[in-house]
């Protein structure tokens, strides 16, 4: 048990340096580590029971209730041939405006100082699962081909200057569905629009925008069209909007949630 906790602490410290949250060195309590690992275990059991090979998996790392949002971060989870589930997702390096794509286990995914110990996922249709699994099994360079390092947590849903984590996941989904024709972010976004995706519109006034831009390296608004930005309409990709879109577009089942008691 002591060895397991030590490993968890190391994993947690690594995530703090990459997940776009506070860079303060806060030692996690054994209780938080245990809860994160319990959530990972229970989620794995439920994913196994679903019969899925690939899901879009979300966590609640921040309190976004004032924006009407429940989940903060989205990844693509898949069941390996060996049995364990892995998650491919984009993480912001703390204190910076850059990000990269990582493959991690469920334990690491849920050890990121969660606001709420709840997992949620969508099981894609069999066709979408097949396409995603094929993409995930390709070379690493293929799965990250639409990733760009410049990062803003509120990047414009239809822009290419920045890219946040949820945006990478859904653009990667688009590329997996049309691998022969989608080779750029603009093409992926055109496919999303064709399928009826609608981003979340956040109402952020000028003082909120100014405070966010000055106080955080990973928040920028200059990629948003002026007519939207200056009317306080910030359109960005959120987990909640993706979860509403996929069933509507016939790409997946209704979202499933599990909350650790």
Task: Please tell me what each predicted stretch does.
Residues 2-8:
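Sec-dependent signal peptide recognition
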Residues 5, 45-47, 141-142:
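Short hydrophobic/aromatic-rich motifs at helix boundaries and adjacent loops
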Residues 8-10, 48, 78:
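Sterically constrained small-residue positions within well-ordered secondary structures
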Residues 12-17:
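N-terminal signal peptide c-region/cleavage motif recognized by signal peptidases
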Residues 18-52:
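N-terminal, Lys/Arg-enriched amphipathic/low-complexity engagement segments
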Residues 23-31, 35, 61-192:
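Acidic/His-rich structured neighborhood in mature extracellular/periplasmic domains
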Residues 51-59:
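A short, Trp-centered hydrophobic/proline-enriched beta-strand micro-motif
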Residues 144-261:
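Activation targets extended, charge/polar-rich intrinsically disordered C-terminal tails
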């Amino acid at each position: 048990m002591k060895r397991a906790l030590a490993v968890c602490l190391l994993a947690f410290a690594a995530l703090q340096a990459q997940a776009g949250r506070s860079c303060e060195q806060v030692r996690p309590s054994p209780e938080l580590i245990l809860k994160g690992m319990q959530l990972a275990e229970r989620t794995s059991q439920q994913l196994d029971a679903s019969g899925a090979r690939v899901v879009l998996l979300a966590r609640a790392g921040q309190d976004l209730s004032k924006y009407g949002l429940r989940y903060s971060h989205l990844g693509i989870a898949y069941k390996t041939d060996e049995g364990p589930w892995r998650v491919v997702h984009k993480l912001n390096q703390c204190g910076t405006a850059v990000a990269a794509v990582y493959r991690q286990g469920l334990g690491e995914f849920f050890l990121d100082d969660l606001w709420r110990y709840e997992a949620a996922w969508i099981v894609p249709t069999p066709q979408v699962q097949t396409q995603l699994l094929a993409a995930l099994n390709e070379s690493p360079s293929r799965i990250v081909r639409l990733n760009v390092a410049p990062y803003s947590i509120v990047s414009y849903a239809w822009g290419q200057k920045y890219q946040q984590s949820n945006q990478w996941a859904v653009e990667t989904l688009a590329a997996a569905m049309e691998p022969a024709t989608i080779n750029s972010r603009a093409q992926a976004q055109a496919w999303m629009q064709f399928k009826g995706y609608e981003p979340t519109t956040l109402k952020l006034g000028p003082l909120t925008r100014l405070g966010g831009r000055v106080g955080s390296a990973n928040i920028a608004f200059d990629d948003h069209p002026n007519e939207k930005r200056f009317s306080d309409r910030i359109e960005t990709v959120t987990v909640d909007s993706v979860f509403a879109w996929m069933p509507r577009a016939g790409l997946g089942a209704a979202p499933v949630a599990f909350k650790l008691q």
